[in-house]
């Protein structure tokens, strides 16, 4: 059995919705969690502390500004959104350095996205496309047919640059189809 790569990881969770923070705390109970519900408190924590990762809401807490801080400090960030779910925010998050872009409807798999990110980083894969491969059918259903056509250059470069590895699935015995709430 694989050891839990999340155990003891320092994770900053940022969201303006208390129920989202509580849900994430429950999902990531093996991690050392800190939370922030405003831009100001999150900015202060990001600038003064060291984290293994940050999970950032896009809308209510100026997530893109926080992503820039996290990227500058080399803190891997996963973007979490409901109201900001759009092709533009998805590509914008990646351009600013986000390691993943997770719709809030997929919140119950946040541990999988984090485990995958940490495992692949250990293997030297900094630009993983696994999260996108897992969520591509969701994005296709949500954004509609041809949604990537608006930014063909970006998505073509993404496909060339971001690696997809089966290492995570083998290590954690995760099926390609995970259960999601929509």
Predicted regions and their residues:
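Two-component/phosphorelay signaling modules centered on CheY-like receiver
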Residues: 18-35
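C-terminal output/effector regions of signal-responsive regulators
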Residues: 119-182
């Amino acid at each position: 059995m694989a050891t839990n790569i999340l155990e003891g990881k320092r994770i900053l969770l940022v969201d303006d919705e208390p129920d989202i923070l509580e849900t994430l705390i429950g999902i990531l109970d093996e991690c050392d969690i800190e939370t922030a519900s405003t831009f100001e408190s999150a900015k202060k924590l990001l600038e003064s502390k060291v984290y293994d990762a940050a999970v950032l809401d896009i809308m209510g807490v100026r997530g893109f500004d926080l992503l820039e801080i996290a990227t500058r400090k080399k803190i891997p960030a996963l973007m979490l959104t409901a109201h900001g779910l759009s092709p533009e925010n998805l590509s914008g998050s990646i351009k600013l350095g986000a390691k993943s872009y997770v719709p809030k409807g997929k919140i119950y798999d946040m541990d999988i996205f984090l485990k995958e990110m940490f495992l692949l980083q250990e293997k030297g894969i900094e630009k993983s496309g696994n999260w996108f491969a897992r969520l591509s059918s969701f994005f296709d259903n949500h954004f509609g047919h041809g949604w990537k056509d608006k930014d063909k250059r970006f998505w073509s470069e993404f496909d060339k640059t971001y690696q997809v590895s089966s290492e995570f699935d083998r290590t954690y015995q995760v099926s390609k189809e995970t259960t999601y709430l929509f």
